Amino acid sequence: MKRHIGVACLVTCVTAASALAQDVRITQELDKVSVNLNGANVVIERNQNQATRLSSEFTKTSRPCPPFCIQPMSLAPGVQTFGELEVISFLQSEVQDGSGLLIDTRLPEWFEKGSIPGAVNLPFSTLEADNPFRDEILRALGASDSTGSWDFSGVFTLTLFCNGPWCAQTAIAVSALLEVGFPPEKLNFYRGGMQNWLLLGLTTTNSAG
């Protein structure tokens, strides 16, 4: 009897260890990251429930093009394209030390449904030339026009994203910034956007504790 109990305990322990070994990690070496955002500690990790399926707008495979056309991997010379690991690294470095901003270029109603932790909502349309408040926005991004022309030497590094590879909002925002003289080396494009972020089960503002 004791032998049977011992075998049962061994099987239970091995099963439990196997379950722990199957945790959904960010990378093989990284299970989660902790980032201090505006004085609050936020943990970014992946959803551990392996039965989870998307059930939102992001389950669609097909949308009319235009306007929902597939975006290129590269938006413009000098503008880097990021994946999820680069976005996480950007949060850990530039956003955390105050030299960078993660920009959600979607409209406010989409931002309020959930975004990437640490993101600032700056709708793409606010960067267009006909917006009377655009100059104020550029100043908030670190630009200066005290000499009568724009000086972008002190701007934040920006990583911009929208709904996903089928969403043109970030492309429009980047184009508007480049047109006014924003340096391309200060711009990063997270092409996967919320579609890929959610697909990988990464923490959002709706799930961050």
Which role does the model predict for each range below?
Residues 88-156:
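Mid-length scaffold segments of soluble, non-membrane domains
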Residues 107-111, 126-129, 164-168, 193-197:
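Solvent-exposed loop/turn segments at secondary-structure junctions
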Residues 113-117, 134, 170-174, 200-201:
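Short, solvent-exposed loop/turn and secondary-structure capping segments
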Residues 140-195:
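Catalytic cysteine-centered active loop of the rhodanese-like fold, especially the PTP/DSP P-loop
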